[in-house]
């Protein structure tokens, strides 16, 4: 037997996971039934691209109610302003008491506060409606999609709707 030098390649196999530097778990900010899944597993997405749509009907109704409440509060404020102005003139002519004037002023202040509250509720309703469209926060690749159309989701679901992995920088 002769021994001679030869070139050999030694290979080793290791299990590993390649991940993007940034993995973003996607959770909904509002609850409801998934009405549309706009992506597939492994699809590349851009920042701001729609991933999911949650049932918008209850949120649209809440917005309409909030808008109506703002209009109602505006009307109440206008009435309270007229009442106060009227009482103020009558008070100057000693027709009504200081108590009546103070009551009208307090009603005016309450109407202003109700309008501010109604406007805040409208902003909240608009935000909630916008949250029904779940968008990608960054460029990347969509991970697994454990939820399908018809699934009931909320901000407290145990598993994210998906994960968007930024794969421009891997490790």
Q: Where in this protein do the model-derived segments appear?
A:
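Amphipathic alpha-helical coiled-coil/rod segments that serve as protein-protein coupling scaffolds
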Residues: 3, 7-13, 25-156, 169-171
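Active-site-adjacent helical/loop segments in soluble small-molecule enzymes
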Residues: 16
